[in-house]
Amino acid sequence: MNGTIYLCHSSCDLLNAGTLESYLKKVADWLRDNPYDVVSLLIGNGDFIKVKNFTAPIQSSGLIDHIYTPKNHSIALNDWPTLSEIILSGKRAMVFMDYEANHDEVPYILDEFTYIWETPFSPTDRNFPCDIQRPPGLNEADARKRMYIANHNLNLEISIAGANILVPNTVLLNETNAVSGFGSMGAMAGNCTGTSSLPPTRYSIYLHRLEKWNRPPNLLLVDYYNIGNVNGSVFQVAAKLNNVTYNGKCCGRTTSLASESLIARLSGKLEMIYSMIVINILVMTIL
């Protein structure tokens, strides 16, 4: 509406979470209130909106004061700043975009696939294969030079009015977001890393294929981070990958679906960067 960007999922008729500017203001306020935390935003620009359209809400929200801008746009895997360096710089927000990012036009909105590759998106397979899906055509040698995202948000295909759409598989959330067990986030992280504790089964060949990365995912993307087999299970997995202990209380829900429709994404280990919460803005629509 009047050129304003809204946060929508697939269609604003399905989910409209308000304007981008209002959301980014909440992020900016949170960063000011939490001076030792780091946030990364991954903008899913499914409508292929030109990157310059995002500068106004970023600036008006106040987030611009916190955004990290790299010195160059060919950062090697081990050259990203550490957590302490990010905090001391005061630039504690990293903004990535999957499509239409342009470093020359807006240097602080980072092109996701220049730095990161992803496992299969919107997975429906509980095996959660750790193969390269995006960007298409990326070879293994180049993938080893980049960070990677493990998509661990289990989906279910349903038909509405003759159209097939994917929705979160909420029935299995406790298992999907669990610390361990088949289909769990902990199991996928271990499989990608090459530290799976699952016994030899018919999946042995599959697991052997996954062990080639020999490092944890840099980001773990989940639906409903506040649901799991134990309180804070997704944070426990991320903590384990970072070789630390999670002592927080998270969100209090372990058995029921959150009433709100917020979809948050949680990071895993970032040896060369930091631990962070990733909010994935799925679709940006100008109404």
Locate the predicted segments by residue.
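Cleavable C-terminal sorting propeptides in eukaryotic secreted/cell-surface proteins
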Residues: 260-287
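Catalytic cores of phosphodiester-bond hydrolases, prominently lipid phosphodiesterases
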Residues: 2-257
